[in-house]
Amino acid sequence: DADITVAFEVSLPELFTVTSAEYEAMHGAWCKAIKVLPHYSVVHKQDWFCSEKYQPELQKDDLSFLDRSFERHFNERPYLSHKCYLFLTKTTKERARQQSNFSTLCRGRITPKELNHEMVVKFMESVEQFERIINDNIKLRRLSDNELVGTEKDSGLIEKYMSLTMDDVTCLEDIDLDARQMRIGDKMLCLHTLSDTDDLPAKVSTDN
């Protein structure tokens, strides 16, 4: 619908490696960064968890005896692979009132009237400020056009999203949507979505 979106890959700290003080600092950074975005901005964070099997790297020449034993020990063990992405989108006041089943393709004008060059410049400046604030605690890396739409050799994020895989080479498969399940190829999809502030706690804190 002609909205502007900037995509990032987020590198989060390992599980159980963050102290209470560091967690509070990260939470404060998120709150501070979100406040610099203009009105009618959408912050969309995605966490992808894919079931995979560990593939050892036994072909490396510099592995010690313990390293090789470690690789063999975890060979083909199942685990959840995690990827995190962040999307910052600039919408308009009119767009914010629209329902999810509305499409501007049914209208004579696709680009919103409020969207202009000055608004785009201000939004991109706020995105850069957002990025600087978050990078003090969490690593953000802006995705390029090729990483989003792909190239002739490598799949982009959109193709991976539509095929439920993180592989560099993807194959688009049939998508089955019904009232009870969502399936892409032979893979089942499970979504946990939060879009209403009433579903969130009033306060976020750590246990001291």
Over which residues does each language-model region extend?
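Extended, folded cores of ATP/NTP-driven motor/assembly subunits in large transport
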Residues: 1-208
